[in-house]
């Protein structure tokens, strides 16, 4: 019986687990370097992101139609984790003294958002 259950577990499809990616395309403002924006992103990851299950990395295009873009890719374990983190971030914007609002002010001073999308990833 144990062998039959083991075979069934290996052969039958199981639930798919998906990370959720938060992808933001932006351009840096004059006077803001990539290194400056990367520094803000590292602070975000170390403080806010880690506490909310969200980790961001930045991508620079090697080939593409616009090499001036910077792409933010935030990664969470699930859509639920992303939703909870987003609720905390969005609600904190009402308090200009919150950690979130202060980080957002630094991001906004350094970049102009072009687009935003989210994706579930599967392996």
Task: Give the role of each language-model region.
Residues 5, 9-94, 105-123:
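Short S/T/G/P-rich N-terminal loop/turn motif that feeds into the first structured element of a domain
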Residues 98-100:
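Non-heme di-metal
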Residues 1-2:
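N-terminal hydrophobic targeting signals that begin at the initiator methionine
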